[in-house]
């Protein structure tokens, strides 16, 4: 009987893992901006669970957090954290207008379907993450990016549920790559893409994070 119970629990856990929502970070670009700094762009494959779809359709606000870090490796001490920044989006549904609303900062966009809202959320574009005076041409840094559902912004009852329910665990792994500052001036190479400045860690120089 104990063996049967364990099998049932294992199958239930396996099913939960198979259907858990997730985010995958793809096509990262860290490129020079017109003002001499650097902007980050990436695509996110966001897999919503039915529980999250139901929650937002019933009026619960969901907050998504993109986090970016840039570190300078130091062989003699801990790595120096050069940049640690984030960007937040708020996803809501308004029953009166039957529209989904996606907000970040002062920007607000409305959509007729959840899929449309998620498509926009999945496209991270031209995020200013690094000033030109923080780095020197030819320097290399460890870069990392992830996106996740910020469960700390949920109402307390949902925060408690999120602790034990995988339906609320919506997050990517940290996507890490090696970023090398172009030797040419950022202003002269504003059209350059990440393929010239970003390399996945453990990949040959000049590659791109996928």
Where are these regions (language model features)?
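Bacterial N-terminal signal peptides
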Residues: 3-16
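Cleaved targeting-peptide boundary
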Residues: 18-28
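Beta-strand-rich interaction surfaces with strong enrichment in secreted/lumenal proteins
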Residues: 27-30, 78, 130-133
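A short, structured loop/turn motif at beta-sheet edges
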Residues: 33-38, 93-98, 133-142
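Short, well-ordered beta-strand segments enriched in hydrophobic/aromatic residues
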Residues: 38-50
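Signal that preferentially marks extracellular ectodomain short beta-strand elements
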Residues: 47-53, 119-136
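Structured domain cores in non-transmembrane regions
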Residues: 55-124
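Glycine-rich, aromatic-bearing surface loops/beta-hairpins
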Residues: 137-210
């Amino acid at each position: 009987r104990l063996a049967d119970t364990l099998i049932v629990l294992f199958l239930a856990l396996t099913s939960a893992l198979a259907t858990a929502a997730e985010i995958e970070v793809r096509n990262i670009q860290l490129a020079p901006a017109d003002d001499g700094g650097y902007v980050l762009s990436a695509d996110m494959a966001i897999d919503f669970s039915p529980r999250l779809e139901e929650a937002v359709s019933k009026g619960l606000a969901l907050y998504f957090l993109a986090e970016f870090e840039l570190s300078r490796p130091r062989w003699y001490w801990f790595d120096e954290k050069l940049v640690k920044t984030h960007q937040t989006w708020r996803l809501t549904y308004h029953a009166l207008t039957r529209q989904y609303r996606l907000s970040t900062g002062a920007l607000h966009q409305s959509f007729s379907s959840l899929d449309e809202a998620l498509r926009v959320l999945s496209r991270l574009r031209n995020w200013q993450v690094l000033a030109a005076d923080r780095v020197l041409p030819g320097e290399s840094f460890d870069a990392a990016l992830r996106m996740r559902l910020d469960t700390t912004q949920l109402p307390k009852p949902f925060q408690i549920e999120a602790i034990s329910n995988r339906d609320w665990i919506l997050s990517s792994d940290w996507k890490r790559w090696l970023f090398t500052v172009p030797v040419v001036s950022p202003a002269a190479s504003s059209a350059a893409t990440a393929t010239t400045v970003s390399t996945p860690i453990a990949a040959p120089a000049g590659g791109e994070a996928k």
